[in-house]
């Protein structure tokens, strides 16, 4: 299962993002979690928008990425989900050109998921060193987190 804009509790404009929506997605077995990342006050935050533009966040509020990632870790690998050992895919759609946002994301992901990232073998890091990850057996990623980062604005 996947969850698009998984912190959105309703619409992507004139509505809210919250951790309850995220935990509900995980409790229902979603293992591909999609997030829109923005720069708000120089901080990396999760929001949602109906637009692909970098300069438009449609939700009334936003959530610090640290809180979001901590919530993911607390639920995704616990007995509160039907599939805690399945690989977890975190898809980050970064809607910012602010380099500090990327640094904050890397720091927060590293500190939150340090023992769960699929990095034990360096072939999975840095765009997989040109290796096709889809050719790898899924069992190689049991209990691991795979980060997918997209910063394209269409």
Regions found by a protein language model. Give the residues of each.
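Catalytic cores of phosphodiester-bond hydrolases, prominently lipid phosphodiesterases
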Residues: 1-154
């Amino acid at each position: 299962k996947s969850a698009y804009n998984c912190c959105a509790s309703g619409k992507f404009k004139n509505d809210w993002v919250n951790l309850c929506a995220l935990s509900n997605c995980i409790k229902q077995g979603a293992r591909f979690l999609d997030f829109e990342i923005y720069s708000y006050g120089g901080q990396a935050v999760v929001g949602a928008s109906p637009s692909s533009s970098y300069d438009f966040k449609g939700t009334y509020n936003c959530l610090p990425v640290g809180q979001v990632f901590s919530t993911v870790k607390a639920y995704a690998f616990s007995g509160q989900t039907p599939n805690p050992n399945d690989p977890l895919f975190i898809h980050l759609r970064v809607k910012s050109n602010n380099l500090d946002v990327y640094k904050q994301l890397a720091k927060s992901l590293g500190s939150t998921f340090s023992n769960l990232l699929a990095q034990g073998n360096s072939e999975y890091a840095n765009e997989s060193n040109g290796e096709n990850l889809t050719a790898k057996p899924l069992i190689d990623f049991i209990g691991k987190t795979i980060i997918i980062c997209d910063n394209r604005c269409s």
